[in-house]
Amino acid sequence: MSGHLHDTLYEDVREQICRKIYEGVFQEGEKLPAERTLAQMLDVSRITLRKSLELLANQGLIVKEAGSGNRVGLPNRGTPSSTDMIVLIAPAENPFFSEFIRAFQEYGQNHDTMVLYAEKPRRETLADSIYRFYQKHLYNIVIWPEDKEVDKEKLRRLRALGMNMVFFDTDCGIPYGDSVVLDNKRAVGQLNSRIAKRGIRRAGYIGWESGPRYSGSLREQAVREAKGADILVRLPWERRREARNLAYEYLKNISEELPPAMIYADWECGDAVSNALSLLDREDILLAGIDDFPGAREKHAIVCRQDMENTVKEIFHCIQIQNQKPAQWQAEIYCIQGKIVEY
C-alpha cells in the first residue's frame, strides 16, 4: 500500500474515533477500549490503529499512560489551521443580517479570506451543524446563534477536536469560543443620557420575556440598573411575528400613564412599539433603542447603531489569535462600542 493510502487510512480511523468523542461514546478521562478490542470495533489492524492513536495523541485528544492504556483528553486551546476560508453561520431572515454579512465579506476580501455562509440550521442542532464543517476540514467558524440553543458540552468537544469558534451577540460559547458583542451597558447609558438632554426624566422599556437572548437580557438589566423603567413591556419571543399586535394590545390596555420616552431592545421591538404608538395617536413619545427600525428616521428616534466595521475586525482578530497562539489562547468577551444617531 502506498504512503498516501496509508495516511488516508490512518486519518479515516482517527476521524472515526473523533466522531465517537464528539458523540460522547468516549468521554473525557475515560480509558479507550484495549487496542485489540478497539481494532476489532473499527475493523482495522492494530498497526493501523496505533498510528491513528499517535495522531490523536499529538492533537491532545488522548493521553497515553504507561501501564494503563489511553485516556480521552479534551484540551481547550486554539488550533493552527488555514484561514483562507472562514465559515459564517447566521440567521438570514434577520434584516440586520444583510449589513452584518456585507461587512464580513468586505473584510474577508480585503484580507484574502473567503467567507462561506451557512444559514442558521432549522432541523439539526447548532453543534451538529458545526461538526459537519469540521468533517470537511473547515476549522474556523463564526456563529450568530440568535435564538438557537447551544449544547455547551458538545461545544467543548468541538473545541477539543480542533474547531476555532467565535460567537456574535451572545456569550453562550464561553469558555470554548470567543464572544464579540455590543457594549450593551454603555449603549443603554448613552441612550439614557441623550433622553435626559431633552429634559425627559421618565422612560419605559420594551423587550423580550423569553428565549435565549443574551443581548436582550443585558439591555433590560442595564435599564434596571440605570434608573429603572416606568413601564416594562416584555413580549414573548416565540410570538415575535405578532410583536406589533402584542405591543399595541399591551399599551392600549395599560392602566398607567405612558412615559414620555420608550427604550426598545432591538429593531423588532422598535418596530412594534412605533406601530403601537402610531395606532394610539401617541407619536409625541420619544423612541430610543438599539438598531434602526423601519421608520426610525421619520419618528426622529435616537438609535444606537452597532459598529459593524469594528465588530467584524474584532471577530477576524479572534480567529487569528486562536490560530497563531493556540496554547496561550483563552476565551474572552469583547465588547464593541455602538454609535449614537439622533434623527
Spans of features found by a protein language model:
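Amphipathic helical "hinge" segments at domain boundaries
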Residues: 11-12, 23, 76-139
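N-terminal helix-turn-helix/winged-helix DNA-binding helices
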Residues: 5-6, 30, 64-93
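Extreme N-terminal segment that seeds HTH/winged-HTH DNA-binding domains in transcriptional regulators
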Residues: 1-41, 124, 132
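Flexible loop/hinge segments that line or gate small-molecule binding clefts
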Residues: 147-187, 291-301
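An alpha-beta-alpha
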Residues: 190-231, 328-343
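Hydrophobic alpha-helical segments within soluble ligand-binding/sensing domains
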Residues: 176-205, 243-249, 305-326
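N-terminal helix-turn-helix
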Residues: 28-64
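Flexible loop/turn connectors
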Residues: 16, 252-343
